[in-house]
Amino acid sequence: MSDDSYEGATAGRVLLFNEGESVKFPTSFKNAMGTDRGLMVLVHKDRLIKIFPLDSEEVLFLSLEIGKLSNDFLTKLSQIFKRAGLVDLLFSTGVCLRGTRCFYECYFNPTQLSSDLGELESSLNVLDGVQRVLIKKVEV
């Protein structure tokens, strides 16, 4: 059975990391994703790289550094996201630790926002427990 005819639950390929920034991405993987672009996310704690199919190159990264996590933090965060029109995240870490620091991070397409970024950032800055808000464009 050739690799092209196998239709199981996963597909794997060994990648070689060289001095340059290029990685050979198999055509069969690209075809399976159904798009010619993707969002690559490195999850530090797991040392795991995930790739998500994209319709557009427009992606924003949102990071919240959390000092003290309250019981209703995620409920309030969800309400802020809903008011801002942020209902379809490309990827979210949930609340996670990196060393002794606590974060919530996500990636999203900015076209879904029903409010501007300034309003979203202001709402997040006053959320109990949030020490720092970072919103930035993800580079191609």
For the regions a language model picked out, list residue spans one by one:
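A conserved regulatory-domain signal marking ACT and ACT-like small-molecule sensing domains
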Residues: 2-13, 36-37, 41-140
